[in-house]
C-alpha cells in the first residue's frame, strides 16, 4: 500500500513531518531487522498516528495477520480507519481518551477508551510484537510506565517491543556538548525524572538518562535486548532518527534481577549518568 493520501493531509505534521512513506519504510526496515518481524505476527502499534507504519506493514505481514493501532488524536484514527481498514480488514484502529500537552490542540476528550481499559479492545497475551514509534519521546515517567506496563499485559509470553526514545548516554551527551545533536535536552520534566527540550512544553521531546530508562524497563517487566543508536545524536546517517530499543517480556519480571542483568552487553560501563548528576551546559 502506498501513502500518497497522507502527503499534504492537514494532520500530516502531527505525526512528525517528513515524507510519510520514506519515514515509515525506514522504521519498518529497522523493525524487520531488529524486532524479528514475522509475517504471521499479531501487532500492536501504540501511537499509530494516521497509519503510515501500518500502511508499510501491509507489505510485510500476512493479509490475515492481526494488527491494532491506537492513538489519542481523533482525526488521525478516523483517517486510518477510512484509508487502511477497508483495504485490509484485519487492521483495526482504536481511539484512546488520554491527554498530552503537545497534542492537546488536536484532542477531544470524549474518546472511546483510556489506557486502563485498553484490554477491552485487545485481548491479554494476544500480541507478538508491540511497536511504539515517537510516543515515549512525549511522555513523562508516570504515563510512560503506565503505558509500558499495559503493553506488557497484552503481550504473549516472550513477546517483544520495538520502541523509540531519546537516550542520554555518554555518546549522546558528548554530541550535545559538541553541538552535533539535534536537541540539547537542558530542561527537566515536571517529575524531575526526565530531561526535556522545552521548559514551556515538557512533552514536546523528552530524553531518558540510562538509569531512569533501566528502571522504567525493569519496572514494566521487560528486559533490554538491544539499543540501536539514532542519528539525532550521531552526527551522521543512521537507521532511525530516534534511538530504537528492543525489549523482551521478562520470564521473571523482577526489577532486582533485571538490574543485575542490565547491560554491559549493550552499553559500556559509565555510559549512563543518573539524573542528579546529569547537566548539559
Language model region names:
Residues 1-34, 50-57, 66, 70-121, ...:
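Class I (Rossmann-like) S-adenosyl-L-methionine-dependent methyltransferase catalytic domain
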Residues 40, 127-128:
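Local beta-strand N-terminus motif with an aromatic residue
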Residues 40-49:
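Conserved class I S-adenosyl-L-methionine
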Residues 42, 159-160:
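Short glycine-centered segments of the SAM/dcSAM-binding site in methyltransferase folds
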Residues 131:
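A conserved beta-strand element that flanks and buttresses the S-adenosyl-L-methionine
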Residues 134-135:
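Short catalytic micro-motifs in class I SAM-dependent methyltransferases
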Residues 145-157:
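A short glycine-rich, Lys/Arg-flanked "PGG" loop and its adjoining helix->strand segment in the class I
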Amino acid at each position: 500500500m502506498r501513502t500518497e493520501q497522507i502527503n499534504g493531509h492537514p494532520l500530516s505534521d502531527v505525526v512528525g513531518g517528513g515524507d510519510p512513506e520514506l519515514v515509515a519504510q525506514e522504521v519498518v526496515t529497522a523493525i524487520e531487522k531488529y524486532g524479528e518481524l514475522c509475517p504471521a505476527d499479531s501487532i500492536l502499534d501504540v501511537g499509530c498516528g494516521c497509519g503510515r507504519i501500518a500502511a508499510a506493514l501491509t507489505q510485510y505481514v500476512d493479509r490475515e495477520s492481526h494488527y491494532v493501532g491506537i492513538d489519542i488524536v481523533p482525526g488521525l484514527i478516523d483517517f486510518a480507519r477510512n484509508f487502511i481498514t477497508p483495504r485490509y480488514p484485519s487492521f483495526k484502529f482504536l481511539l484512546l481518551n488520554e491527554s498530552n500537552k503537545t497534542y492537546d490542540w488536536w484532542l477531544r476528550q470524549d474518546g472511546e477508551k483510556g489506557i486502563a481499559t485498553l484490554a477491552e479492545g485487545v485481548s491479554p497475551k494476544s500480541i507478538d510484537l508491540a511497536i511504539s514509534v515517537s510516543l515515549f519521546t512525549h511522555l513523562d515517567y508516570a504515563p510512560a510506565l503506565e503505558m509500558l506496563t499495559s503493553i506488557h499485559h497484552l503481550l504473549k509470553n516472550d513477546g517483544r517491543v520495538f520502541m523509540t526514545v531519546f537516550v542520554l548516554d555518554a555518546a549522546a551527551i558528548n554530541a550535545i556538548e559538541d553541538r552535533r545533536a539535534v536537541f540539547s535536552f537542558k530542561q527537566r520534566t515536571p517529575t524531575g525524572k526526565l530531561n526535556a527540550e522545552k521548559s514551556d512544553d515538557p512533552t514536546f521531546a523528552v530524553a531518558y538518562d540510562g538509569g531512569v530508562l533501566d528502571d522504567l524497563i525493569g519496572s514494566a517487566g521487560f528486559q533490554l535486548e538491544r539499543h540501536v543508536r539514532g542519528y539525532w545524536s550521531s552526527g551522521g546517517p543512521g537507521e532511525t532518527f530516534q534511538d530504537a530499543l528492543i525489549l523482551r517480556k521478562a520470564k521473571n519480571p523482577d526489577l532486582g534481577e533485571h538490574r543485575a542483568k542490565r547491560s554491559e552487553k549493550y552499553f559500556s560501563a559509565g555510559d549512563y549518568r543518573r539524573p542528579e548528576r546529569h547537566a548539559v551546559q
